[in-house]
Amino acid sequence: MWRKTVRLGLLAIAGLALFTLAVACDEEEAGGPTAAPGVCVPQMPPEGQANLFHNPGFEAGGGPWCSLHLEETPPFEVSQELAHSGESSALLRMRVPAEEGGKAKVFYLVQEVTPEQFPELISGYYRVENWTKGTPKQYLQFVVIAFDVPNLTPAYPNHQMRYPLAGISEEPFNIANAFFVFLGKEEPRTGEWVYFERNIKEDFQQFWGAAPAGFSKLRVLFEVRYDDKEPGTAAAEADVYYDDLYMGPASANPNQP
């Protein structure tokens, strides 16, 4: 089936850790990459909607899901091959050969939003169709980052919660400005949509002592990634779909397991 695909390599800073964010590049089509939005622009909440995400089901294309690096295309495809609802979903393709190693590679969706109040819940669905583990630290997660938060201590440029969904059972690295909460510790199930949800407001209250207030923006990432890959071990491959993503009040959550 002919499909347009998106590939890139990029570099970003998350908190105090520096990661290489890259996506394998191959030329499987003659038409070139799909036109897509650029670097992230923080979004005002959609009017009249509880969901703070714009285009949560990718039915309107790729935007405003974005890139963390200037002049590069967001590292995902809008796919019509599989969808939890509607016709589209976001597809992250990991293709890293065995001979390649490195500290980290992250394949991600990201959106930045500027609500007045910190949201309560994140929910959504993921689906894994291909999973070849190239390192023990290959996993799915979503990450919530609040920037310029005056009411949380210690003072950092941002404060994070990280939520591994599948693939690892221990924290993959130490990071001073983040806490890990595991929503799953097993290898990902393949060939089925898996529901996830978490009350992120309660987690910030529990781990950071309060829900963020007065922040400049929120950044939310949905990822497949690895850390600490040794060259020559095994190829790291994954096809991961995300769909029907929600962030807002728990009472208005449209997703049900």
Model-derived segments and spans:
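Extracellular glycan-recognition surfaces and repeat-rich motifs
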Residues: F58-M94
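Extracellular ligand-binding interfaces
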Residues: V128-R189, Y241
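Secreted extracellular polysaccharide-interacting domains
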Residues: L92-Q117, L121, F173-L183
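C-terminal motif of bacterial Sec signal peptides marking the signal peptidase cleavage site
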Residues: L21-A24
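Extracellular carbohydrate-recognition regions
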Residues: E27-E72, Q256-P257
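Bacterial N-terminal signal peptides that target proteins for export
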Residues: M1-A12
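Extra-cytoplasmic beta-strand recognition segments
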Residues: F58, F107-F147, E197-I200, D244-L245
